[in-house]
């Protein structure tokens, strides 16, 4: 995974609550075994009309949202079935951060395990960010080290994250990488405690 320390990026807002994983990445696109290539299917049923052409009314299809790396949405983002493909699709599309008042627990943890930073902010703060996200030039800075989200206009809010998950993101590690860090300790433990022939 890529280390996450500070990220500055354009925001895009989807002003909807209860966006479920079936909307994030529809089931017909889950047959792939790679972790890449899912971005083209992100929000497929909303992004495309029935004839396959882009839906000009959908937020992410608007020109002002092109290149956005921070997604702002309403509460209970990522509810529904547990599919790790949802964070993969968001990342593959280009998002590094998702901001919402609340997330479904499994989705939240899947994001952290895959290097996508989900940030919970108060509903009023999210409403403000959704309004600001309508501007083509609006950017946010996210400092994981300081656990803070801020813009150039005076908005600044702290956010909470589990210290263990924070360290993994800062280093760009997943749980397998962490195991390799302790490989010598694990081998020493096995030598001391495993039965010998």
Curated annotation (Swiss-Prot):
It catalyses: (2R,3S)-3-isopropylmalate = (2S)-2-isopropylmalate. InterPro entries: 3-IsopropMal_deHydase_ssu (IPR004431), Aconitase/3IPM_dehydase_swvl (IPR015928), AconitaseA/IPMdHydase_ssu_swvl (IPR000573), IPMI_Swivel (IPR033940), LeuD (IPR050075). Pathway: Amino-acid biosynthesis; L-leucine biosynthesis; L-leucine from 3-methyl-2-oxobutanoate: step 2/4. Keywords: Amino-acid biosynthesis, Branched-chain amino acid biosynthesis, Leucine biosynthesis, Lyase. GO terms for molecular function: 3-isopropylmalate dehydratase activity. Its EC number is 4.2.1.33. It comes from the Bacteria. GO terms for cellular component: 3-isopropylmalate dehydratase complex. GO terms for biological process: L-leucine biosynthetic process. Catalyzes the isomerization between 2-isopropylmalate and 3-isopropylmalate, via the formation of 2-isopropylmaleate. Belongs to the LeuD family. LeuD type 1 subfamily. PANTHER family: 3-ISOPROPYLMALATE DEHYDRATASE SMALL SUBUNIT, 3-ISOPROPYLMALATE DEHYDRATASE SMALL SUBUNIT 2-RELATED-RELATED. Heterodimer of LeuC and LeuD. This is 3-isopropylmalate dehydratase small subunit. It comes from Geobacillus kaustophilus (strain HTA426). The gene is leuD.
